[in-house]
């Protein structure tokens, strides 16, 4: 089990980062919000979960151990694999996922591509008693935004399953709401996903 990795970021993409650890480049699958905090050439630590399949070994990375624990818990629900669990964390921060499950907020859960009404109800039914304490307070998200946020959000949306045209439309709509200080990329991504959810 690889619990975490620490190394220099050598590359990033819409859904992954490469960290050089002891001369070896490790490809780590990450949610867009996690990738937004990474900088090529800078050291980073990611909490990780290794998913072993018959034909592959895939390392998933997270900003902290809390997100990793929730990723692993989500996979204990029927029909939830690592990709869908990561998609949940790409759309909502861990505290929002816990709140949605604890409060049976299926509307929030169905904003995740790949989760329909029945899937959301199943998540609530199977995980509600195991989700742990739900923090009181508003949704929060950490991240560093650069001038390249529209492309980061666009790539993240395409990676989550929307078409390039839908992603472009959502990015344009979000850009029109940005006035003054630009919010972190994860906040902008969730705003775009909410817009796309209303057009489904």
UniProtKB/Swiss-Prot annotation:
GO terms for cellular component: cytoplasm; Holliday junction helicase complex; Holliday junction resolvase complex. GO terms for biological process: DNA recombination; DNA repair. Signal peptide: none annotated. Residues 64-142 are annotated as: Domain II. Residues 1-63 are annotated as: Domain I. Residues 151-200 are annotated as: Domain III. Residues 143-151 are annotated as: Flexible linker. CDD domains: UBA_RuvA_C. The keyword Cytoplasm applies. One of its GO terms (molecular function) is four-way junction helicase activity. InterPro entries: DNA_helicase_Holl-junc_RuvA_I, Hlx-hairpin-Hlx_DNA-bd_motif, NA-bd_OB-fold, RuvA, RuvA_2-like, RuvA_C, RuvA_C_sf. Pfam families: HHH_5, RuvA_C, RuvA_N. SUPFAM superfamilies: DNA helicase RuvA subunit, C-terminal domain, Nucleic acid-binding proteins, RuvA domain 2-like. Keywords: Cytoplasm, DNA damage, DNA recombination, DNA repair, DNA-binding. Its main location: cytoplasm. Homotetramer. Forms an RuvA(8)-RuvB(12)-Holliday junction (HJ) complex. HJ DNA is sandwiched between 2 RuvA tetramers; dsDNA enters through RuvA and exits via RuvB. An RuvB hexamer assembles on each DNA strand where it exits the tetramer. Each RuvB hexamer is contacted by two RuvA subunits (via domain III) on 2 adjacent RuvB subunits; this complex drives branch migration. In the full resolvosome a probable DNA-RuvA(4)-RuvB(12)-RuvC(2) complex forms which resolves the HJ. Has three domains with a flexible linker between the domains II and III and assumes an 'L' shape. Domain III is highly mobile and contacts RuvB. Belongs to the RuvA family. HAMAP family: DNA_HJ_migration_RuvA (MF_00031). The RuvA-RuvB-RuvC complex processes Holliday junction (HJ) DNA during genetic recombination and DNA repair, while the RuvA-RuvB complex plays an important role in the rescue of blocked DNA replication forks via replication fork reversal (RFR). RuvA specifically binds to HJ cruciform DNA, conferring on it an open structure. The RuvB hexamer acts as an ATP-dependent pump, pulling dsDNA into and through the RuvAB complex. HJ branch migration allows RuvC to scan DNA until it finds its consensus sequence, where it cleaves and resolves the cruciform DNA. This is Holliday junction branch migration complex subunit RuvA. It comes from Salinispora tropica (strain ATCC BAA-916 / DSM 44818 / JCM 13857 / NBRC 105044 / CNB-440).
